[in-house]
């Protein structure tokens, strides 16, 4: 467990484990007034920290760590791709495209290369965008999930919280 100053990024302490009793015992060394001055606590997506944080820092906002949000939505797309992939015969073009080009499907679309490469799956020289286009023609149901994933990534990285949460609530 690492406690760090949000503004300065200075490490306050590194506890030897993540158990609630260890965390509670450490922070109860600080006065209630000092703990009430804490404004923000950033956590991973483990729900186990939230109850203890509310007790230790009653006035603090609890913020989910950016990395873990990206990891969570990335895993969701990956699981969806695998579920769709399993509907096809292993030797089919759809299965091979979904299996072989998983990294392209997961990649931030703004970071796709413009360079061409030879695709053994499609047996032609194409760009990553063209490859994705071919995959979505083969497996149109993946396109909606991909588009949502890309929108969530974009709004999260651009810190457009309003749009990010609207997308989550709409879907």
Ranges and model annotations:
Residues 1-3:
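Gly/Thr-rich phosphate-binding beta-strand-loop-beta motif of the actin/hexokinase/Hsp70
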Residues 6-10, 14-16, 21-25, 29-61, ...:
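Acidic/histidine-rich catalytic cores and adjacent linkers
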């Amino acid at each position: 467990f690492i406690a760090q100053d949000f503004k300065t990024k200075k490490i306050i302490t590194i506890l030897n484990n993540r158990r609630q009793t260890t965390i509670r015992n450490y922070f109860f060394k600080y006065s209630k007034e000092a703990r009430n001055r804490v404004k923000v606590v950033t956590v991973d997506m483990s729900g186990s920290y939230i109850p203890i944080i509310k007790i230790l820092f009653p006035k603090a906002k609890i913020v989910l760590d950016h990395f873990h949000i990206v990891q969570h939505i990335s895993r969701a797309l990956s699981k969806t791709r695998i579920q769709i992939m399993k509907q096809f015969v292993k030797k089919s073009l759809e299965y091979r495209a979904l299996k072989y080009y998983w990294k392209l499907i997961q990649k931030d679309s703004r970071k796709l290369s413009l360079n061409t490469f030879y695709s053994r799956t499609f047996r032609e020289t194409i760009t990553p965008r063209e490859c994705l286009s071919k995959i979505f023609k083969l497996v149109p149901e993946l396109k909606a999930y991909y588009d949502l994933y890309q929108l969530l990534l974009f709004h999260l990285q651009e810190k457009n919280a309003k749009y990010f949460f609207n997308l989550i609530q709409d879907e």
